[in-house]
């Protein structure tokens, strides 16, 4: 069940069963619609705590009032508690969700060294030729290398890639198309997957002929499988709630740390507003300040 479908059912529940006021029902409907958009209309079961925190944190950065943010927190906690109670999800990701305070940092990002270690390990595993290992390595290299949303990655077709130019054509929020670059490691990982991994996966079933990344049964790889992959590989270092968006956060932060132009990063990420991208400059500044405090004798 998608988060949109579940949200519609919950809004009906609070209106008909809990009999909340019409104004509160309208507010909850709006809040949950915003959450669904932020989560890229994913399956309800794929939404995790980090995404919920990230969504609320963005509201803080926009300057939304304390009362509005508190209401959104209540709406989300009520929604997921109801979803768990009614069997729509097996676990409630909002149990540890609290109203964020102003100044809260971004959800945790992986360091460049941490990601290098993970990707090096996956590359070594992929050299054995297992189709799933080749795919998994290519997935993580491209997620991080191109700073993609999980929906953008899962929606890629083989024809969307230009390995010579190292670019991918993706469809982002609002069905907006953009071309994003990726580096040599991602290009080599994808090439190896296309030559040695994907053909083996494609033989298992029909229906994924155009899709770049195929699942174990030969169809298009879904967001849930990508979430499981990222959690398995990055969870030990970043926490059990880590998801694909952590790689996007990390890529944006590392680009700015490396001196990339803010507007270039905006285009890579597909942000409609430069203000959304500027959030990552706060992270870079905080990292610099932390390094200063640790290293400077007069800090």
Model regions and ranges:
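Conserved catalytic core of the tyrosine transesterase superfamily
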Residues: 1-299
């Amino acid at each position: 069940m998608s988060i949109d479908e579940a949200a519609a059912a919950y809004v009906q529940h609070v209106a008909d069963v809990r009999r909340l006021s019409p104004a509160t029902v309208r507010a909850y409907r709006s809040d949950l619609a915003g959450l669904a958009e932020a989560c890229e209309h994913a399956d309800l079961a794929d939404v995790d705590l980090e995404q919920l925190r990230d969504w609320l944190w963005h509201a803080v950065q926009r300057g939304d009032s304390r009362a509005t943010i508190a209401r959104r927190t209540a709406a989300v906690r009520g929604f997921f508690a109801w979803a768990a109670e009614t069997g729509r999800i097996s676990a409630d990701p909002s149990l540890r969700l609290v109203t964020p305070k102003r100044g809260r940092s971004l959800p945790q990002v992986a360091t460049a060294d941490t990601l290098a270690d993970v990707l090096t390990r996956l590359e070594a595993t992929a050299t054995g030729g297992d189709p799933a290992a080749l795919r998994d390595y290519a997935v993580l290299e491209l997620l991080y290398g191109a700073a993609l949303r999980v929906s953008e990655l899962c929606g890629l077709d083989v024809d969307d890639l230009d390995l010579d130019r190292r670019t991918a054509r993706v469809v982002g929020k609002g069905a907006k198309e953009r071309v994003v670059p990726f580096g040599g490691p991602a290009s080599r990982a994808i090439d190896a997957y296309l030559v040695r991994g994907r053909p083996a996966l494609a033989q298992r079933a029909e229906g994924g002929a155009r899709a770049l990344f195929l699942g174990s049964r030969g169809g298009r790889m879904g967001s849930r499988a990508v979430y499981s992959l990222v959690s398995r590989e990055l969870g030990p270092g970043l926490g059990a709630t880590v998801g694909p968006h952590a790689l996007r956060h990390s890529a944006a932060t590392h680009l700015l740390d490396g001196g990339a132009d803010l507007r270039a990063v905006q285009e890579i990420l597909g942000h409609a507003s430069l203000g959304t991208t500027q959030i990552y400059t706060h992270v870079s500044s905080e990292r610099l300040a932390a390094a200063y405090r640790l290293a400077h004798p007069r800090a």
